[in-house]
Amino acid sequence: MQTLAQTLSVQAVNASLTQLLLTLADTSKAISGAVRHGALAGVLGATEQENIQGETQKKLDVITNDMLKDALKADGNVRGLASEEEDYVVEVNAKGEYLVCFDPLDGSSNIDINSLVGTIFSVLPAPAGELNEQSFLQAGRKQVAAGYVLYGPSTMMALTTGQGTQFYTLAPDSQEFLLTDDSVQITPDTAEFAINMSNQRFWEAPMQTYIADLLLGEIGPREQSFNMRWIAAMVGDVHRVLCRGGIFSYPTDNKNPAKPFKLRLMYEANPMALLVEQAGGKASTGYETILDIQPTEIHQRVAVILGSANEVDTCLSYHGIDYSEEPSID
């Protein structure tokens, strides 16, 4: 089996991006160890702090954020970073070529129940000139790499450098990420959906109707039965979609009119959308292709509908949108 470094060499990924991706991979190994130790290391539970989103930070949120910050600061290829756990962008190395956006521990509410969590990351080219928030506000199609690391029964990385989506599995003995799927492909059709049904009454009418039709099964307009899956961690739900197809959504809702969206564009929706598109799937807000959105702020939130291409198209048809054409890639 090829190592991560060997695969990046075969893909002719340049040396600076290769080094950055290896830095992220090495740091994820350390994070995997921290997650695995859990209560034995006293890292479970919450802090008394909130992040900029107003969410109470778990101890491991802070620990993993610091681990990634320290590693990226030591990597001369990184110009700056943005994190779910940082109020503002962080300048790193003046000569760095790349910007890194990340969610250090997605699904951290799962930590205390020993369920799935992961790290999500996005790599963008660093524009010339002074570094500020505007430097990061690039559409998702500008990403030069994106991926996540899932800390489950085995530690797995999903990665794209724009040459399809690959899976790597961390070998326990060698501590190397080994290529275990060189061309992940999402099935175009599916009978599985992932959504937080407890919010159903707050959704827009198109999504309420779409889900209601799925629940009607064989007696409804879809004329087939669907199963629901929900891990409560985007990284876990998207991993399942990449492995066996499905549609995942965190749609617009009016539960809190001031916050109609849940997921963050720059370090959740964009990297996942690129992974999904590179695996043959689609990703939309319901009204706009996610990778085409021009960001307006680093912690911007968006609605997300992604997964099996034909099922995403069907969902979008309920929204009055025809996205049956292939997305254009600059």
UniProtKB/Swiss-Prot annotation:
<feature type="binding site">
    <location>
        <position position="106"/>
    </location>
    <ligand>
        <name>Mg(2+) 2</name>
    </ligand>
</feature>
<comment type="similarity">
    <text>Belongs to the FBPase class 1 family.</text>
</comment>
<keyword id="KW-0479">Metal-binding</keyword>
<dbReference type="Pfam" id="PF00316">
    <property type="entry name" value="FBPase"/>
</dbReference>
<keyword id="KW-0460">Magnesium</keyword>
<keyword id="KW-0378">Hydrolase</keyword>
<comment type="pathway">
    <text>Carbohydrate biosynthesis; gluconeogenesis.</text>
</comment>
<dbReference type="GO" id="GO:0042132">
    <property type="term" value="F:fructose 1,6-bisphosphate 1-phosphatase activity"/>
</dbReference>
<feature type="binding site">
    <location>
        <position position="103"/>
    </location>
    <ligand>
        <name>Mg(2+) 1</name>
    </ligand>
</feature>
<comment type="subunit">
    <text>Homotetramer.</text>
</comment>
<dbReference type="InterPro" id="IPR033391">
    <property type="entry name" value="FBPase_N"/>
</dbReference>
<dbReference type="GO" id="GO:0000287">
    <property type="term" value="F:magnesium ion binding"/>
</dbReference>
<feature type="binding site">
    <location>
        <begin position="106"/>
        <end position="109"/>
    </location>
    <ligand>
        <name>substrate</name>
    </ligand>
</feature>
<dbReference type="InterPro" id="IPR000146">
    <property type="entry name" value="FBPase_class-1"/>
</dbReference>
<dbReference type="InterPro" id="IPR044015">
    <property type="entry name" value="FBPase_C_dom"/>
</dbReference>
<dbReference type="GO" id="GO:0006002">
    <property type="term" value="P:fructose 6-phosphate metabolic process"/>
</dbReference>
<feature type="binding site">
    <location>
        <position position="103"/>
    </location>
    <ligand>
        <name>Mg(2+) 2</name>
    </ligand>
</feature>
<protein>
    <recommendedName>
        <fullName>Fructose-1,6-bisphosphatase class 1</fullName>
        <ecNumber>3.1.3.11</ecNumber>
    </recommendedName>
</protein>
<feature type="binding site">
    <location>
        <position position="84"/>
    </location>
    <ligand>
        <name>Mg(2+) 1</name>
    </ligand>
</feature>
<feature type="binding site">
    <location>
        <position position="262"/>
    </location>
    <ligand>
        <name>substrate</name>
    </ligand>
</feature>
<feature type="binding site">
    <location>
        <position position="105"/>
    </location>
    <ligand>
        <name>Mg(2+) 1</name>
    </ligand>
</feature>
<keyword id="KW-0963">Cytoplasm</keyword>
<dbReference type="GO" id="GO:0030388">
    <property type="term" value="P:fructose 1,6-bisphosphate metabolic process"/>
</dbReference>
<dbReference type="GO" id="GO:0005829">
    <property type="term" value="C:cytosol"/>
</dbReference>
<feature type="binding site">
    <location>
        <position position="268"/>
    </location>
    <ligand>
        <name>Mg(2+) 2</name>
    </ligand>
</feature>
<dbReference type="Pfam" id="PF18913">
    <property type="entry name" value="FBPase_C"/>
</dbReference>
<dbReference type="InterPro" id="IPR028343">
    <property type="entry name" value="FBPtase"/>
</dbReference>
<dbReference type="GO" id="GO:0006094">
    <property type="term" value="P:gluconeogenesis"/>
</dbReference>
<dbReference type="GO" id="GO:0006000">
    <property type="term" value="P:fructose metabolic process"/>
</dbReference>
<dbReference type="GO" id="GO:0005986">
    <property type="term" value="P:sucrose biosynthetic process"/>
</dbReference>
<feature type="binding site">
    <location>
        <position position="196"/>
    </location>
    <ligand>
        <name>substrate</name>
    </ligand>
</feature>
<keyword id="KW-0119">Carbohydrate metabolism</keyword>
